[in-house]
A protein has these predicted regions:
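Conserved ASCE P-loop NTPase core motifs with emphasis on AAA+ ATPases
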Residues: 1-14
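Short helix-capping and inter-helix turn/linker motifs at the boundaries of alpha-helical repeat units
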Residues: 2, 81-82, 355-356
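Conserved ASCE/P-loop NTPase catalytic core
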Residues: 14, 18-20, 26-27, 31-243, ...
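Structural motif
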Residues: 16-26, 303-312
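Short, well-structured alpha-helical segments
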Residues: 25-30, 316, 392, 396-400
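Phosphate-sensing "switch" segment of ASCE/P-loop ATPases
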Residues: 199-212, 220-363, 370
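Short acidic/glycine-enriched loop/turn segments that link adjacent beta-strands
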Residues: 417-420
Length: 436
């Protein structure tokens, strides 16, 4: 379907279904799909679940017989001489009733979701699933029986190459605090970063590489950024106001009273969108790009001071995904990633949402200790209490990655002649960088 603009058509589909406040959010989901396809092009020539691989015992090992993402091509994107991961995992952060689940279900709902495929086990379309409300480490990543074999059907393995949704991400973060799932967070971070799952257990190893993308919702008070989740997730911020709540009520009423003719038209448009996304995946896998070239405008945008160094790769992935989902696709040549007006607006909006979330904790620390000089040990304790939920090591890392980059924060060793340990003091204030 040459000329079919999936960004415009998906927005039309959502607006005619009376979705509220989605114009700056839907493109991120589409870019996530595009970057997921690109990641498969780059990494799925090696598959731990390929029944034809000489390293896989088809009778005893878990296999995915029909995977539409599996291919025999060489990697095309290897910055720093490493095999880069380009998945965009999405975290929707918003209060209860703000429409987080509705956005995820628009793509992943069984039957009606734009990515759902009834024949996914036969290799048609993506593998998709809405995750359970409660999950353990063993249920997510696997455990072994007395003979060292992986038990059950761990989600991270089952959804390799697909999309896994969670209506409330706290079900996973809460599980990591229980004795039976202490390693949940570390396994999650690693599997989202490079796909590796590796657990040493008394009876054997849980070891495989998976390539699933996570879309999840969370409420602000339940969102923990202290352990590296912020580097693995693209954050979409959803605010809720009395006016927006009234708009939601009106939208629900209109959607309930939709005419039959309109429902039929929207069903056909949904089928078109499903078909286009599936065809784009199949076309790109069969005829992949030969490399990636970012133009200077992309580099200039990423060089902006408000984009932190560890965030630049997330926005680079967004740009890749955006171009993988353009109306006209050309394989067999490098993917030229340019900065058009729509991509620039998408990057600007995404950065603004990310700053709102990422800087909330920093503003709390700044306003609490403004114009004070505190011992470094006390600052670490306060950050641990206020930001990182009692994790002392995460608090020290948070200070290094966030506070130390601010012009209003300065660490110094006081000039004093008194005996004993001097220690480091931390100054919060407009003159933090002045000579002490």
């Amino acid at each position: 379907m040459s000329g079919f603009d999936v960004f415009d058509k998906t927005l039309e589909f959502a607006e005619r279904n009376y979705y509220i406040d989605i114009a700056d959010k839907l493109p991120v989901f589409l870019c996530s799909i595009g970057s997921h396809i690109f990641n498969a092009i780059n990494k799925c020539s090696r598959c731990d679940f390929d029944p034809d691989s000489p390293l896989v015992d088809e009778e005893n090992d878990f296999t995915i017989i029909n995977c539409p993402l599996r291919h025999g091509n060489l990697p095309i994107y290897t910055p720093h001489s490493r095999l880069a991961d380009t998945r965009i995992n999405i975290m929707l952060r918003g209060p209860k009733g703000s429409g987080k689940s509705i956005l995820i279900l628009m793509f992943l709902a069984e039957g009606a979701g734009l990515l759902d495929s009834p024949n996914q086990d036969m290799g048609v379309g993506f593998r998709t699933m809405m995750g359970p409300n409660s999950v353990t480490e063993a249920g997510m990543f696997g455990s072994v029986d007395e003979e060292g074999n992986i038990m059950g059907r761990p989600l991270a393995r089952e959804l390799c190459g697909g999309f896994l949704g969670f209506e409330e991400f706290s079900s996973m973060s809460d599980a990591s605090k229980k004795d039976h799932s202490m390693d949940m967070k570390n396994q999650l971070l690693t599997s989202l970063d490079n796909g590796r799952v590796q657990k040493s257990m008394r009876a054997g190893w849980v070891q495989y590489t998976t390539r699933y993308t996570v879309w999840a919702g969370t409420q602000p008070a339940r969102f923990e950024l202290d352990s590296g989740l912020d580097r693995r997730f693209f954050i979409i911020d959803i605010d809720m106001t009395p006016q927006k709540e009234r708009e939601y009520k009106k939208a629900q009423h209109r959607a309930s009273n939709m005419a039959v003719e309109e429902r039929v038209e929207l069903a056909n448009l949904g089928i078109e969108l499903k078909s286009w996304i599936r065809n784009r995946m199949e076309t790109a896998i069969a005829n992949p790009p030969t490399g990636v070239i970012f133009d200077d405008d992309i580099g200039e945008w990423l060089d902006h001071p408000t984009v932190r160094s560890f965030e630049s790769d997330l926005f680079r992935r967004l740009a890749i995904g955006y171009h993988m989902m353009q109306p006209d696709y050309h394989g067999g040549m490098p993917l030229l990633v340019t900065l058009d007006d729509r991509l620039r607006q998408l990057l600007d909006d995404s950065l603004a949402m990310r700053r709102t979330v990422m800087d909330a904790d920093m503003e709390l620390i700044r306003s609490t200790f403004w114009k004070q000089d505190l011992p470094k040990s006390q600052v670490v304790k306060e950050v641990s209490r206020m930001v990182t939920n009692g994790d002392y090591q995460s608090a020290k890392r948070w200070i290094t990655e966030n506070l130390e980059l601010q012009s209003w924060y300065y660490e110094y060793e006081p000039n004093t002649n008194r005996r004993g340990r001097k220690g480091i003091l931390c100054r919060f204030g407009p003159d933090a960088g002045d000579e002490i």
